[in-house]
A protein has these predicted regions:
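Conserved catalytic cores of very large enzyme subunits
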Residues: 2-206, 242-245, 249, 253-571, ...
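Extended non-globular scaffold/tether segments
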Residues: 207-219
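A generic alpha-helix surface/boundary motif
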Residues: 225, 291-295, 576
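A conserved hydrophobic secondary-structure block that centers on an alpha-helix together
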Residues: 230-241
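Short, conserved catalytic/metal-binding motifs centered on acidic residues
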Residues: 236, 556, 578
Length: 587
């Protein structure tokens, strides 16, 4: 038996749905941008956090919705599958510069109609010098201008887009529903003392949270109504029943708690989707999916409401829907990240907080569903450890043999002690998940970019260290300089120059990050994402603001450490170069 047969095949309709999505031509989609522009214009007197809430509300009320005829789940990001919405509040610069070039790219080609071009031209003037990129650049101190001008720092991802790189608290969303969040916000808002100046800002934030919760509830209700309308016209009895069930589920979740596996899947998808309508930050991840979904799965299995095959088809549908999420990046950005990656990570396996193997029946079903779909999204990560279920780990290896690069493996034996060593509470360390391509974090508790986003061109930094602090590419001085390579007497002299140069460059990159983070705090607060991450509601601040005062487990120290680790991800090439230089010194 080959590996494909080992995991079985997609159902006929999921196979057809998969092919439809894979064959869909990605278009630039202006609808969100137009609605966002209208919301910003209509609410210029409002605090920015309220503008963002009203923007999301307007988008969710006004955007086109549809239900694919082969789908078991409702919810779309754009007017068609795989279309890429435009997020003008971050930047319009590259969009307008490349308006006639999207279809001519070597990679990550996007198609665009003349109507869409005209829509974007109409709204572009409003956003000129009025977005995150403009304000982020305005906050940069002069001392880092040379690094931005020469491109030695790769900061485009943070200037042109949202952040993400997290997993929200899906477990609480399922158990409490947004209704539970709403109740808490109302209680906290009622208890505010407005003689305290901070209460003014908290009140606005709480009002914004209530606005987006209402918007999400109404958005789901739109799908409930649409599913009912489609069911009334449907002639196939089975599909009619599915649409009626979908209508009932969408009328309930995510506002109400989920009580079944189908409700839980739909609730998770709505949140995963809407967070990527609110912001285009990638690496918005599902967290420990097999852990928080397991109670709903087993409840339905034990009560005979669902079979393993039903759950398998539902999950394959979820992963196909996950692939429909898209993002357009600038042409220069695509040179280093082609393939339209969204890095929506699903984590399974690992250990429980009481240090037992966490593999369960749903872990196997998730693994099988990903094996059947064989897609680039979601990214599947398996946490492994010394006592992991052997059969499960063997199955992971069988999936690897399929050759589509999944699952990735995260070693609990390394990651958990590292987290604890840096001050993370033990129970949180044991509950970590993957949040993107390679990063890890505590789901539902860590905020934006706990892993940093400054990409430093280390080969150029090495050459700079060898050239007394002067960049060989631009001829401009980067650092104070620590000698020329031709004048260094030993390999240790080179390493010392390299060490000092890297430290200087890292310091400058932190300055750049701080400026952009500050612009993000002020300009593009994400209200829904904040509400669903602990404990933004408790402190009355958005996720964009630092967590220093509210996190007591030293995880802020960890965040700075991980930011540095992000810098060091690209050191293989200069490391190899240094080794070659060592051989030259020896000769």
């Amino acid at each position: 038996m080959n590996n494909t047969e080992h995991f079985g095949k997609l159902t006929e309709r999921m196979q057809a749905f998969r092919e439809e999505v894979l064959d869909a031509k990605p278009y630039i989609d202006a609808q969100r941008a137009v609605l966002a522009t209208e919301a910003y214009k209509e609410n210029q007197n409002q605090p920015r956090v309220m503008v963002r809430a009203l923007m999301l509300q307007k988008i969710l009320e006004g955007m086109s919705i549809y239900i694919d005829d082969k789908s078991l789940i409702a919810g779309n990001q754009a007017t068609k599958n795989k279309n890429a919405p435009i997020f003008p509040e971050y930047t319009m610069e590259f969009v307008m510069n490349e308006l006639d070039l999207f279809e001519k790219r070597d990679g990550d080609v996007f198609y665009i109609t003349e109507e869409t071009k005209e829509q974007l031209r109409e709204i572009a003037p409003f956003w000129e010098n009025n977005n995150l990129r403009a304000r982020g650049e305005a906050l940069l101190p002069e001392e880092v201008d040379v690094f931005m001008e020469t491109g030695v720092f790769g900061m485009e991802g943070k200037l042109n887009a949202g952040d993400a790189h997290l997993a929200v608290n899906y477990q609480r969303i399922l158990s409490d529903g947004l209704k539970g969040y709403e109740k808490r916000v109302k209680e906290l808002r009622a208890a505010l003392d407005f003689t305290d100046p901070e209460s003014i800002d908290k009140n606005v934030f709480y009002k914004a949270v209530l606005t987006v919760i209402e918007a999400v509830r109404d958005f789901a209700q739109r799908y409930s109504k649409l599913a009912k309308e489609l069911a009334d016209k449907e002639t196939d009895a089975k599909r009619k029943e599915e649409l009626l069930q979908m209508s009932k589920i969408c009328a309930k979740v995510p506002y109400e708690p989920a009580n079944s596996f189908r409700e839980a899947v739909q609730s998770v998808w709505f949140i995963q989707l809407i967070l990527q309508i609110e912001s285009n930050g990638h690496s918005l991840s599902y967290g420990r999916f097999d852990q928080y979904m397991y109670p709903y799965y087993m409840k339905d299995i034990n009560e005979g409401k669902i079979t393993k095959e039903d759950a398998l088809e539902l999950l394959t549908c979820l992963w196909i829907k996950t692939l429909t999420i898209n993002k357009v990046r600038s042409q220069s950005h695509t040179l280093s990240s082609a393939g339209s990656p969204m890095y929506q990570n699903v984590t399974i396996g690992g250990q429980t907080t009481d240090k037992k193997d966490a593999v369960n029946e749903l872990s196997f079903v998730v693994l099988q569903s990903v094996a059947q779909t064989r897609l680039t999204q979601p990214n599947l990560t398996v946490r492994y450890h010394a006592n992991i279920d052997k059969h499960f780990f063997d199955e992971c290896i069988e999936v690897m043999k399929l050759g589509f690069g999944m699952p990735a493996l995260n070693n609990d034996e390394i990651i958990i002690p590292s987290f604890i060593n840096w001050g993370v509470k033990e129970e949180d360390a044991y509950n970590y998940s993957a949040i993107g391509c390679v990063e890890t974090a505590v789901p539902g508790k860590w905020g934006y970019r706990c892993t940093g986003m400054s990409y430093i061109n280390f080969p150029r930094v090495l050459l700079c260290a060898m050239n007394d602090g002067v960049d060989l590419t631009s001829g401009k001085r980067f650092t104070k300089g620590y000698g020329k390579f031709t004048e260094m007497e030993t390999y240790e002299d080179l390493l010392a120059a390299w060490d000092k140069t890297v430290r200087e460059m890292t310091r400058y990159s932190v300055i750049v990050e701080n400026a952009i983070d500050k612009a993000s705090e002020r300009d593009v607060p994400d209200v829904l994402c904040s509400a669903l991450t602990d404990d933004c509601i408790g402190r009355g601040k958005t996720i964009n603001f630092p967590f220093l005062q509210s996190q007591k487990d030293s995880s802020d120290i960890l965040c700075h450490h991980l930011a540095l680790q992000q810098h060091l991800r690209c050191t293989a090439l200069p490391g190899a170069s240094a080794f070659s230089l060592l051989n030259c010194c020896r000769e």
